[in-house]
Design a protein with these regions (language model features):
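Conserved core of the sugar-phosphate nucleotidyltransferase
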Residues: 100-187
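Residue-level signal for inorganic ion chemistry
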Residues: 1, 27, 81, 94-95, ...
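Acidic helix N-cap motif at the loop->helix transition within catalytic regions
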Residues: 50-55
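Hydrophobic helical membrane-anchoring modules
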Residues: 193-212
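N-terminal glycine-rich phosphate-binding loop and ensuing alpha1 helix
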Residues: 1-49
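Short phosphate-binding loop-to-helix
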Residues: 57-90, 166
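Short beta-strand-to-loop acidic/aromatic patch adjacent to the donor-nucleotide binding site
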Residues: 88-98
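Residues at the starts of beta-strands that form the adenosine-phosphate
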Residues: 38-40, 64, 90, 116, ...
């Protein structure tokens, strides 16, 4: 679970992953969704350790959690987390600020892993255009999928992909896997599995948390 980001777009003094929903930080709501896993590796910013430890004992999953410090970039944080993964296991890499993911979806994704990468995605509902050379070019929205997390792999495969990584501008693990020759399978995701990035996202998550 990747929770080392600073979340500057949230305009909050408190890092967004530690904002409370029903008296519990977002990151611990997310951890709860993976409570049936054998081990939960949580990657956080070293500067945030006091925020994390404040709620760790109350989580009920202290014995399952392996706490790891993140790097300067997402890629570095993933690499730090992968060091502690058994190569013979399957791994789900998830954003700490996607607390509405369901356990059903997590299990569906992780059980579908073979020699591939399995990711959730949802189709685009709005019209889309690409801005190129000063022009707005219309594109077929049926060909566009918004990719979510968790992104699931056989641990050795994603470790190998990261060890061969050359393009450090990539923004998700599936892209790293694909650049190493891996195949990606997209499973229909969940509309409410949104990433909390802005104050509006936070309000949407709060509203939906009461319903789910």
């Amino acid at each position: 679970i990747l929770g080392a980001g600073s979340g500057t777009r949230m305009n909050s003094k408190l890092p967004k992953q530690y904002i409370l929903i029903k008296d519990k930080p977002i990151i611990f709501h997310t951890i709860e969704k993976f409570s049936h896993f054998d081990e939960i590796i949580v990657v956080i910013n070293k500067k945030h350790i006091s925020f994390f430890e404040k709620h760790l004992n109350d989580s009920g999953h202290k014995n399952k959690i392996k706490l790891v410090f993140g790097g300067k970039t997402r890629i570095e944080s993933v690499l730090n987390g992968l060091k502690y993964i058994d190569e013979n296991s399957n791994v789900a890499i998830h954003d700490a600020v996607r607390p509405l993911i369901s356990k059903v979806m997590i299990d569906k994704l992780i059980s579908s892993v073979k020699n591939n990468c399995v990711v959730p995605g949802i189709k685009l509902k709005d019209s889309a255009r690409v801005f190129e050379n000063g022009k707005a070019i219309s594109i077929n929205r049926e060909k566009i999928i918004k990719i979510q997390t968790p992104q699931c792999f056989h641990a050795k495969d994603i470790k190998d992909a990261y060890s061969n990584l050359q393009d450090f501008s990539l923004t998700d693990d599936a892209s790293v896997f694909e650049m190493n020759g891996g195949k990606i399978e997209v499973v229909e995701g969940e509309e409410y599995n949104i990433k909390v990035t802005t104050p509006l996202d936070l309000e949407i998550v709060k509203i939906n948390y009461e319903k789910l």
